[in-house]
A protein has these predicted regions:
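FAD-dependent oxidoreductase catalytic-site/capping-region signature
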Residues: 1-126, 134-143
Length: 143
């Protein structure tokens, strides 16, 4: 995805393009995830008494590509987007390990967007840890 700053006025919201399911890897993971849920819910003994049925995306969709396409029509992030400004050393990373935006002087990103991948639990605690580490980095830079 991308974020475009439209104005130096902080009251003007940026243009945000999420680009969900835009990579082969995203679509493959979405398809595999739906297949896992199907196996656990529709085929396991644990749910048999509840006679579960699949409404979306629908059992007619079998391959990862069609599953991802259908998932894209109704899926959302539940307000936990991460990895939009990924930290790392690879070409797709936005910030370095000191949280500084690559190629821009005096700008850091200090939020869940720097996580390279989403955590398996709630994102709140890791985000607070990132902020705590950032405060140390900023203080040390001033020494």
């Amino acid at each position: 995805g991308s974020i475009e700053i439209k104005s130096s006025d902080t009251r003007i919201y940026p243009k945000i393009k999420m680009n969900y399911l835009s990579t082969d890897e995203d679509r493959e993971i979405a398809g595999k995830s739906i297949k896992i849920v199907r196996r656990v819910v529709l085929e396991s003994k644990a749910f048999k008494d509840y006679t579960p049925e699949e409404y979306r995306p629908g059992t007619q969709f079998k391959d990862n590509e069609s599953l991802a396409r259908e998932a894209g029509k109704f899926a959302n992030t539940i307000f936990h987007p991460v990895s939009t400004c990924k930290m790392g050393n690879d070409e797709n990373s936005v910030v370095s390990d000191n949280l500084k935006v690559k190629g821009i002087k005096n700008l850091r990103v200090v939020d869940a967007s720097v996580m390279p991948t989403i955590t398996s639990g709630n994102t709140n605690a890791p985000t607070m840890m990132i902020a705590e580490k950032a405060s140390d980095l900023i203080i040390n830079d001033q020494k």
